[in-house]
């Protein structure tokens, strides 16, 4: 029987340290986060008498690079996990994964496994879409694994003996969605009798990226006012927790209609409005929140941020939410009636291992293990 498995591979510039990782997406299950594990292949002559450390680094950029003048910078690095890889500990407090076991068997004595434990409150990988004329790194939260040679874990690493590989911290759609969203709002008028009533219902609470959101709307006009126009939109809420006034909203899909209008007093209207929030229609908008992106990978609108406790938010995080909003226009004097429903927009949990590709940060190496003849071959992509 033949087993094939692919891993990401990246070497230090001096060729003495090589990092192998089976994946670059680590799932946040809200209460816990998948550990980051891999294998480091070391040149035994080079590391003799030295120490090798592994770290998970979170970078948070909250301003444009071109605005950094006179020593001012808008960039923070957070070291969320750290471990001494070499010399290895006498006793390991975790079990090796199957990929780690296979890599150690294939690579030989110089291969050392490692595992970094991620705190559950760490922010998700989210970036803010830059403007068309902006240069430099986008604002947002990104992660990478860093392997380096140094005297201590706080020692400044040298570029030639350092490996840094970008990763992502992601969340997937929950297995059990919540109740169907529904709301009813009413508007009274000071000098007129009766009410205008707007009822909104979504067909479900959880939507997958690319799905169409069906907004079921029912208007009951018990007043003597006239509804002249209806406008619906999907809003993306972005909360940059670091700033007190860091909350704003982006319209990522919208529709305006006069079907059934003008809606006269004593009339009612039932209508279903279809809206599809996608990045394809928002590529020219600065500040749209996107899922963290690896090289050569496509991205989408940022997924909804799920929090165990909404009051316990990381100060360096970006919290994303979505809502469907419908507005009835009654004219300049009578004003408007607005209803809003929050919903969840996420990626489904992957049912199978997805295809992985090489990029400018990491090669992809395939190991082929023949368990009958105990022979192995390696192919590099």
From Swiss-Prot:
GO terms for cellular component: cytoplasm. Disulfide bonds: none annotated. The keyword Endoplasmic reticulum does not apply. GO terms for molecular function: G protein-coupled receptor binding. Keywords: Sensory transduction. InterPro entries: Arrestin (IPR000698), Arrestin-like_C (IPR014752), Arrestin-like_N (IPR011021), Arrestin_C-like (IPR011022), Arrestin_CS (IPR017864), Arrestin_N (IPR014753), Ig_E-set (IPR014756). One of its GO terms (biological process) is G protein-coupled receptor internalization. Pfam families: Arrestin_C, Arrestin_N. It comes from the Eukaryota. The keyword Cell inner membrane does not apply. Belongs to the arrestin family. This is Arrestin homolog.
């Amino acid at each position: 029987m033949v087993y094939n498995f692919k891993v990401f591979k990246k070497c230090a510039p001096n060729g003495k340290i090589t990092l192998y990782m089976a994946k670059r997406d680590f799932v946040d299950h809200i209460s816990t986060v998948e550990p980051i594990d891999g294998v480091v292949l070391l040149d035994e002559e080079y590391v003799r008498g030295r120490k090798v450390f592994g770290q998970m680094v979170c970078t948070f950029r909250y301003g444009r690079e071109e605005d950094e003048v006179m020593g001012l910078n808008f960039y923070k690095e957070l070291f969320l996990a750290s471990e001494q890889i070499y010399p290895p500990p006498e006793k390991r407090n975790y079990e090796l994964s199957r990929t780690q076991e296979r890599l150690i068997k294939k690579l030989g004595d110089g291969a050392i496994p490692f595992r970094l434990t991620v705190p559950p409150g760490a922010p998700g990988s989210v970036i803010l879409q830059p403007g068309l004329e902006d240069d430099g790194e986008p604002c947002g939260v990104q992660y990478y694994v860093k392997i380096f040679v140094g005297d201590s874990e706080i020692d400044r690493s040298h570029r030639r003996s350092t490996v840094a590989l970008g990763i992502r911290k992601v969340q997937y759609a929950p297995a059990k969605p919540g109740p169907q969203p529904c709301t009813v709002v009413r508007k009274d008028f000071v000098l007129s009798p009766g009410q205008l009533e707007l009822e909104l219902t979504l067909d479900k609470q959880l939507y997958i990226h690319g799905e169409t959101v069906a907004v079921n709307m029912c208007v009951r006009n018990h007043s003597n006012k006239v509804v002249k126009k209806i406008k619906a939109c999907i809003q993306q809420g972005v909360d940059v927790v670091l700033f007190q006034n860091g909350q704003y909203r982006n319209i990522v899909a919208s529709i305006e209609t006069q079907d059934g209008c003008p809606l006269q007093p004593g009339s009612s209207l039932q209508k279903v409005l279809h809206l599809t929030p996608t990045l394809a229609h928002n590529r020219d908008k600065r500040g749209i929140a996107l899922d963290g992106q690896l090289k050569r990978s496509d991205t989408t609108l940022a997924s909804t941020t799920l929090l165990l406790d909404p009051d316990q938010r990381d100060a360096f995080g970006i919290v994303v939410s979505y809502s469907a909003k419908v507005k009835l226009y009654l004219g300049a004097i009578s004003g408007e009636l607005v209803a809003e429903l929050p919903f969840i927009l996420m990626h489904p949990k992957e049912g199978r291992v997805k295809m992985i590709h090489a990029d400018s940060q990491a090669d992809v190496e395939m190991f082929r293990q023949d368990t009958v003849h105990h022979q192995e071959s390696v192919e590099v992509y």
